[in-house]
Amino acid sequence: MVLSLTQGLDFSPAPFSVGLDKWSSSTGTTSTDTYDIVGEAVYVPVDQDFAGCIKMVKTYDVQKLRYTGQTDLPRETYLMIKTRVKRMAGGIPAIRIAGHAIDTNDTHVDAVTAYGPTGSLTDLGEIYEVTAIVGPGLRDGVDMVWGALPHYGHFGIDITGPTGAVVRIDDITIEDVSHIFQRDALNIVDVRDYGAIADGVTDNYNAFVAADNAANGRRVIVPTGEYAISQSLSISSHVEFQGTLVMPESAALLLTKSYDLPTYIDAFGDEAEGFKKAFQALLNSSDHDSLDMGGRTVTVSEPIDMQAAVSTRDTFTQRRVIRNGQFYASGSLGWEPTIVQGQASYSINASRDLTNVENIADIEVGSLVEGAGVGREVYVTSKDVSGGSIRLSKPLYDAAGYQLYTFTRHKYLLDFSGFSTLSKLNLQNIEFQCKETANAVMLARVGLIFHMIDCFIKQPKYRGITSIGTGCQGMLIDRCHFVTAEAQTNATDRVSLGLNANNNDVKLRDNWASQFRHFALLAGSNNIITGNHFYQGDGVQGGARLAGIILTKAATSSSIVGNYVDNCFIEWTNEHDETPDFTSGFGFSSLSISGNNFLSGAVAPWFNYILIKPYGTNHGISNLSVTNNNFRSINGSISRVEWVDTTYADINRSRLEAILFEGNNFENISRATQNPLIVEHTQSSANSVWTLETNNELPFQSYAKRVTALAPQAQIKTSSNSAYFDIPYTTGQVGSDKDQVKLTFGTLVKGKMAVTVRRD
C-alpha cells in the first residue's frame, strides 16, 4: 500500500532551512551532537543549483549526516531516500545514503544493511544524485533490506574518502515507492517499467515483449493510456488491459493465456474492433481452437468483413469455433442494401456466367441476382471487372440472351464472403440480434462443414444464413432458432428467408423457425432434414401459404424425416437447371418424406403439403417415398396433400415409377392419397367387365397402371346366382384420364372385390 497517497503521510525530513539542530553528526538518536553545535556544516540559503543547502567540510573518515527525527517504517512499505550533492573543493570523496534502524523498544537493530550504494564525486561542480531504497523485503532494487524488526529509522548520508573535501548537499527527500514492489506482491508486471509509453505514437513492441519475458508466471498489466504496437505481438503471460492498443490492421495480437473476447475488447476499447482482432488471432495461432465471447454483446454498426479482419489470408481449413455471445445490429445507415441494375448476356453453354455486364464495377460479390428466367437465391460468386463477366452460384433456367438484371447486396453482421475458402467453422451459442435492419451470416465462397449450433437468429431483414457459392458443402445447422421480423405480415408478402445452400450434404436438425417467407432453400442433393419445426401461418382466413422447405435439384436424393411442417409445404423444383426440359437422367427422383407432422389451419382448400414444380417439360417422378406422416387440416379441409404446379410445365404421368405413399394419416383431407391404393368395388348387376375408379387417390392424380392383388369380399356369382371361381384378368390405365382399371371375367358376374392398384 502506498501510504503517502492513502493516508497522506510525508516521510521526508525537515529541510535544512529549518535549522541544523535537526541534523546529527552521528546516528541521529537522542543526545547525539547536531551540526548547529559541532560546526563542520553551515546552511547556504542561495546556491545556483540548489534552492537551499548545507555546505560541509569532511573532517572524519566517515562524515555522517542523520536526521534526528524519526522516519516511520510501516509494514510492507518501501522508501526511497534521495538527495543531490556536488563537490566544491578538496579531494574526491564518495557518498552514500545511510540509516540507523530502531525497533519498537527504541533499541538499535544492527543486523540490517545500514547504507546504500556508494558513488564518487569525481568532477568539481558536477551535480550527483544519490539514492537508495530501504524496505522489509529482499526484492530487486532494494538497497537496504531491513526486514520486519525496525519500527523507524534516522536517515541521511555518509561521506567517505579523503578528508578536506568541501561539498554542498541539497535537501534530503524520502518517497514512498511501495507500489513498485507491490507488483511483485500482487503477482503483476507493469509494461511501463519496461519502457512502454502511452502516447499512442511511440512503438511499444519491445517494451511489451520485455515485460512478457520478465513476467515469469506473473500477470502483465497495461495501465491506462494508448499504446502503439507496430507489428504482430504474442504475449504468453496472463494480461490485463486498463489501457488500449493501437495496431495496424495486418498486425495480430496473440494472447495465449488470456484469449477471450472480453480481454480483446479491453485491449482495443471497442467491441467490434476487439472481436475483429480476436478472430484474427484465432486464425493466426495454433494455441486455441475456439474464441469464447464470454457472454459479451458486440454492438455492430456496419457489416464485419471477417476476411478483412484477418487481412493476411483468405484461405483457412482447420477447425475453429466462436461461441457464447451476442451480435447486436445498431443504427441503419450501415445496413442498407446496395442495388445495381445492368444488362448482361447469358448462354446455357456457359451456364454459370453472365457476360458483357453493365455497371460491373458497382456490382458487389455476394449480390442476389434477379431477372427473368432466374431461379431463387442465385448469387454473384465472383466477378472479372476487366473481362466484364460475373460468376453465378447457380445456372439460370430461362435467361438465354441479353436482358436486364438486378443485383442486390444485402448486409450481414458476420460476412465471410471475402474468404476464397473457409472450412470447419463452428458458431455455437450465439445470438444474432439483426433488429430488422441487418442480416445474420454470409458464408465463404468455398468451404466444408460450416456448423451452427444452438444459435438464435432474430429478426433478420432479408436473410438469416446465405451461401453465395459452395461454402455450404456439408453444412450442419443444429438446434437453432430462426425468429422472424415479419410475424405481422401476410405469408405471401414476406421477403425474408431463413437460409439457403447451393451444394450437397446439408443437414438441418432440431431447429425452430417462425414466419419467414421460406425456412430453407436447398439447391444441392443428399440433404437430411430432421426434427425441425417451421411455422409460416398468418391471420388470413382461407389464405395462401408458401413453401417452408424448397428443394431445387430434381435428383435430390434427400430425406425429410420427423419434422413439424406447420402451415407451409415442401416444394420440389428444378429451377437451377439451365436445361430444365427433361432429356435424360433421373428427373424428379430420390426423396423420402417420412414421419412428419403436417398441419395447416384456415387455409385455402387448394392448399397442398407436397408440391412439385417442374420448370421444364417431360419430367417424371421416381423413387419417391411418402410414409407414416400425419396430415391434418384444421378450421377447414383441403382437397389433397400433394400436387403439381403447372405454371411452367406438367409432369409426364407415364413416367411415374417407384412411388410409395402409405402408412399416412389424414384428417380433413378430401382425398387420402395412397400408392399402392386399395379400391373396393361392388358390382350389383352381372357383367363380364368391371370398371373400378381410383377417385383421384393415386399420387399426383396419376395413371392407374396395374393391379397387384385381388381379394373377393363376398362370393362372386353369375347372373343366375351360381358361384363363380375363375380369376379375372386385369387392364390398367383405362378411361380418358387413365385412372381406372378393368377386371375381365369369363362370363357375366356380380359381387364385391377389393383390388390393390399401383401407379408404378
Stretches found by the model and what they are:
Residues 34-64:
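Short carbohydrate-recognition loop motifs
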Residues 60-97, 130-132, 172, 694:
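Extra-cytoplasmic beta-strand recognition segments
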Residues 130-167, 172:
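Extracellular beta-strand ligand-recognition surfaces/modules
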Residues 170, 243, 290-295, 318-329, ...:
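Right-handed parallel beta-helix
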Residues 175-206, 245-246:
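Right-handed parallel beta-helix/beta-solenoid
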Residues 247-284, 298-316, 324-400:
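Autoprocessing Asn-cyclization modules and mimics
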Residues 254-281, 303-311, 335-338, 349-353, ...:
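Extracellular beta-strand/beta-solenoid scaffold signature
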Residues 673-760:
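Extracellular attachment/recognition segments
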